[in-house]
Amino acid sequence: MEMYVEDVPMPDIGPDSVLNTPIRPKYEILKSKKKTQNENDPEPMDISMSPDEKNLKKSTVRRKLRKSKPNSSSNQVSSRTRALTKRSNSSNAIIKANNQDSVYVSDWTNVHRDIPIVVSGYLQLMFNACVASIFLYFLFKIVFGIQNDVRNRVEYHKILQEEQAADCQREYLSINCDSPGPAIFEVCQKLKQCKMESSNNVGSTKLAALVFAEIIDAFISHISYKTMVFSLILVFGSLLTSNYAFGLYRARHSQNIHDYAANAIPAMIPSSRFLPSNLSDISNRNLIEAASQEEEI
């Protein structure tokens, strides 16, 4: 490859400048020419080539450059497709996981469809137990209160009778009723009868009945009929309403389970044929009965 070399005359004026311009050495001029030639031409070309050959070579170089550009674009496209495939794979994995979770949830709900019925039964039992315990608490409190009142009243009557018997004994001795005269005979008989009565002969049953009657009388006199009726309606009405509500809920839930099973499970004919899913339950039952009758015949 022959390079073009230009002879630059060296001035005799001096090494500094010619007409106030800096003087460059010869090798710097050659270097700048090579640089400009490399910038203009993608490849160094032979000077001995004809203009047609030069144009042909330039066109081939341009074609090569054009062909090299799509490679980068294809790489970009391939990278984009890889990214898209990765995203699609990740999205498919997420969808599969969600589907598996939904299938698991649906299986669990299908297996445990009777959980609301069981829970409602336990809630009804707890509510009834709470109401019954409150009612029994007040009832036992009233009963124990009546027993304490009866016991205290019996003890009080025993003490009174003992004191009365002691008074009768003192009077009997004071008037000398051991040898009574006809004037004091009746009085001595009464004092003797009073003295003979002891505290063990107190009628506990009569006293208990008397105390119970007094308590009921006081209870009714202090509490109005409206309050009593309201309390009874509150207790028994809450029991009846709660039991009716829980029973109605269980009945409707069991009916919904029956309808769901009839619609979800396809009706199967004994001849291993399945009915279409768009038929109603009545038509399915009729067809099943007809098929079973045909097989029996």
UniProtKB/Swiss-Prot annotation:
Signal peptide: none annotated. It is found in: Endoplasmic reticulum membrane; Nucleus membrane. Residues 70-79 have a biased composition (Low complexity). One of its GO terms (cellular component) is perinuclear endoplasmic reticulum membrane. Its main location: endoplasmic reticulum. It comes from the Eukaryota. Residues 57-69 have a biased composition (Basic residues). The modification Phosphoserine is found at residue 90. It is a multi-pass membrane protein. Pfam families: Brr6_like_C_C. This is Nucleus export protein brr6. Keywords: Endoplasmic reticulum, Membrane, mRNA transport, Nucleus, Phosphoprotein, Protein transport, Transmembrane, Transmembrane helix, Transport. Involved in mRNA and protein export from nucleus. Belongs to the BRL1/BRR6 family. The chain crosses the membrane at residues 126-146, 203-223, 228-248. Residues 1-91 are annotated as: Disordered. One of its GO terms (biological process) is mRNA transport. InterPro entries: Brl1/Brr6, Brl1/Brr6_dom.
